[in-house]
Amino acid sequence: PNHLVTLPMQLLTPQWLLCLNHTTEVLENQAVLINQDLIQAIGPREEMLLAHPGAERVDLPGQVLMPGLINCHTHAAMNLLRGAADDLALHDWLQTRIWPLEGELADAEFVYDGTVLAAAEMLQGGITTFNDMYFYPDQVVQAALDVGSRVFAGITVIEFPTRYAAEAKQYIELGIAARDKFKHENTVHWTIAPHAPYTVSDDTFRHMAMLAEELDLPVHCHLHETASEVSDAESRDGIRPFARFEQLGLINERLMAVHGVHLNEHELQAMAAKGATLVHCPASNLKLASGIAPVAAALKAGVNVVIGTDGAASNNKLDLWEEGRLASLLCKGASGDATAFPAGQLLMSMTCNAAKALGAEDLIGRIAPGLQADLIAVAVGEAAHQLPNHNLISKLAYSGASRDVKHVWVAGVQVVQSQQLVGQRAQLVGEIMRKTQRVWQTRVEKVG
């Protein structure tokens, strides 16, 4: 594991430092000292250089150093299904394309290979942590470790048989076994991940809620994604899925409710009061014509709103810069309030607020002593589209781009240097890319 390798101290000297320590203050002439996997100190550049002459100096001129981005909802392995199911509404997308494809193809090898590609795409775009929900979480984790990303893997349950498991009990047992297997890895974390109200029973939800309490983990679940999910539940159960979640005791600070496109004012108030999080995935919601989540109302109610890309089969990119920009612009346009979801709040929703949602506030999402060194250096003065720089926060929020991310560190290890994956990672990703063109493309088309 990474953390057993001793790394030299690294002293990073960026032109600008954006700590996002629940504030959007931009500092200049600062240095950040990394010791092993941790941020050890932050201070004035000259003082730090004198105090740590032995540290390996990494000069970052024309760049801003900031916390790595946190993608709060994805299905990484679905990178192999990118472009396999387009221009369909959610129900048709799942029933006619995705579930049949997964039934045929989604084995351990599929999950490993797809997650390797996704982790590479995300790291190169400045995403250092992804919150995943998929089958074979042991493979998800192995892929993340091999590429160098931090991962929150889901102990996923969907109550129908797949290649991975037959019924709820087995899904849970396999998930717990995977968690035990990787318990010594400092970049591997877990969530309890029931798929959705329409694929998981009350008994299983109750059991998973208990498990989340017992293991102190977040609960990661799709909720109110489409209008039909809500109306079907009303005619079937006489109650909206959200109210059912309330009865089951799921609406609390552990809950990361994904999509929430069809949440009403009362439900948003309840989420805010209980400290639940809304994970907003605007591109997927637009592409599947699910609608536009009530983000302005959620923020006004005091709900913690964070951002996810969803999987590449419904986005079709894993680009958090683009996702965040879309989230903010949609929020303004849909609410008629140009001040809604401002730049600073957007950047925090992809860093410190995302960490809070994952119960990892003291671990990631900010640049502060004692936190994990998950950092990205973003070029802000090298290309025409990056200038001028009189408002860095606005620049990053509204015109920041994956192609501007130069260097990436995860747990103190530099995994991307000058936009390229470092070391063995590049070879691994190259191999899987070739295999995808040779093997997976054909297999996906065959099921087609």
Give residue spans per PLM region:
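His/Asp/Glu-enriched, well-ordered alpha-helical/loop segment
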Residues: 247-254, 296-382
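Catalytic core of soluble alpha/beta enzymes
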Residues: 225-255, 260-273, 286-299, 311-322
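Divalent metal-coordination and catalytic microenvironments
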Residues: 15, 32, 37, 62, ...
